[in-house]
């Protein structure tokens, strides 16, 4: 009985470890892809646990990072946790389908898994297109690199008038980069 519980527990930790490594791979891939410059104006859609937020705000000197998340609780939690280290970053409550910023505010927008889970992805992509400056870049990460999902997102981005689409693959995840 004890061996059975230990076996189940070790399976859990193996799965957790694999998921954690994949998450870190995706986060590093996104940060590398964005190529953060000190004066960038960046929008993060979905703050997650705040690790990418912290990494980016450390690199920005004159620029800014704004993050929106649909969870009010998460916005409060991340704001409190990073109160001293916010630097050039701010966290707001908001949805990808209704981004609370003016047209052409950001030169870079990125999403780690959040846009995929929104209720109307076409509306979310339209909003992202609206807040991006001309020649601004949108970065979206996708968990699996299945061809069907990749083709679907590329077509959705093309339908919203994004151009110069490129795909960056690493491990079992990919990042699609699109230009306004």
UniProtKB/Swiss-Prot annotation:
The name of this protein is: Putative methyltransferase YrhH
Q: What is the lineage of its organism?
A: Bacteria, Bacillati, Bacillota, Bacilli, Bacillales
Q: What is its EC number?
A: 2.1.1.-
Which Gene3D superfamilies does the entry link to? Vaccinia Virus protein VP39
Write down the Pfam families for this protein, in alphabetical order. Answer: Methyltransf_11
A GO molecular function term, named singly, is: S-adenosylmethionine-dependent methyltransferase activity
Q: Under which main EC class is this enzyme filed?
A: transferase
Name the family. Answer: Belongs to the methyltransferase superfamily.
Write the record's keywords in alphabetical order, separated by commas: Methyltransferase, Stress response, Transferase
A GO BP term here is: methylation
UniProt xrefs under InterPro entries: Methyltransf_11, SAM-dependent_MTases_sf
Concerning CDD domains, the annotation shows: AdoMet_MTases
Q: What induces it?
A: By the natural cationic antimicrobial peptide LL-37 and the synthetic cationic antimicrobial peptide poly-L-lysine (PLL).
